[in-house]
Design a protein with these regions (language model features):
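Secretory targeting signals
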Residues: 25-60, 64-65, 92, 96-159, ...
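Terminal transmembrane helical anchor/hairpin motif
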Residues: 38, 163-248
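Aromatic- and glycine-rich beta-strand/loop motifs that create alpha-glucan
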Residues: 1-21, 245-247
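Helix-loop-helix units of permease transmembrane domains in multi-pass membrane transporters
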Residues: 65-99
């Protein structure tokens, strides 16, 4: 826990906090610009649409670059790699820091939906349990993408290159989902996109790809897939860092 806390403390004054707040808030606000949602379900659907297909996965890439940027300054990399701390702990700590920020984005999204729904739209009652459940499940699904983006950011000084890679992976994932390519959800970025839409629609035709119902089975499958993919990426990153200086 201490390594993760240390990584979070490194982000004091970082723009990562602004990214984690502004992207989900902008998504919810934009959901109300052209068409006024007349219910909680429609507000949620419109909020997670473009957010899940582009903003969130690319946002994870930006957060990963910000988390690793401090290590690529001056001689910080040499100091990091020469410490007695096992490489896997560093990789896990970085991934966890990125994932915590991603989870914060999901919390902000849910809170923004509640605030806009009650304060601006005057919707009756409170947001349905779907919002909380889907938000929590999406946070879990972000873990593999956080690990992959962390790995990409670890191997380059460039801030923009990992973001560009994240944009490309997001585009590939969304395109392949729209093309109904079997198993594409095993791509971390596609898993994020698919999970953001879970339970939001009764039929997948509204998004162009199949949308799962939110059930215990679909939730368990998402959690299991996320855990396995995250473990694989972290193990591969650790092995690669142990074998190379990883500097460009």
């Amino acid at each position: 826990m201490k390594p993760v806390l240390a990584e979070i403390l490194k982000l004091r004054g970082s723009t990562s906090w602004a990214v984690a707040v502004l992207l989900p808030v902008a998504s919810v606000v934009s959901a109300c610009i052209f068409v006024r949602p007349d219910g909680w379900r429609l507000l949620w659907i419109r909020s997670v649409g473009f957010y899940g297909m582009a903003l969130l996965p690319v946002g994870l890439a930006v957060l990963a670059s910000l988390v690793w940027r401090v290590e690529h300054r001056g001689s910080n990399w040499n100091v990091l790699m020469s410490t007695p701390v096992p490489t896997w702990r560093t990789v896990v700590a970085k991934t966890a820091a990125i994932w915590l920020l991603a989870s914060g984005m999901q919390l902000v999204l849910v809170l923004a939906v509640a605030a806009v729904g009650v304060g601006a739209l005057g919707l009756p009652g409170a947001p349905p349990g779907l919002c909380l459940a889907a938000g929590a499940l999406t946070a879990v699904a972000c873990a593999p993408a956080c690990a992959l983006q962390s790995a990409i950011s670890a191997f380059t000084r460039s801030f923009a290159l990992p973001v560009a890679a994240g944009l490309c992976l997001t585009g590939v994932g969304t395109t392949m989902l729209l093309a109904h390519v079997p198993g594409i959800w095993l791509l971390p970025h596609a898993l994020v996109t698919r999970t953001t839409q879970i339970g939001a629609l009764e039929r997948g035709s509204a998004t162009g790809f199949t949308v799962q119902d939110l059930t215990w089975g679909s939730a368990a499958a998402t959690v299991g897939t996320a855990a396995i993919l995250t473990g694989i990426v972290i193990a591969a990153t650790t092995l690669a860092l142990n074998r190379t200086d990883a500097r460009n």
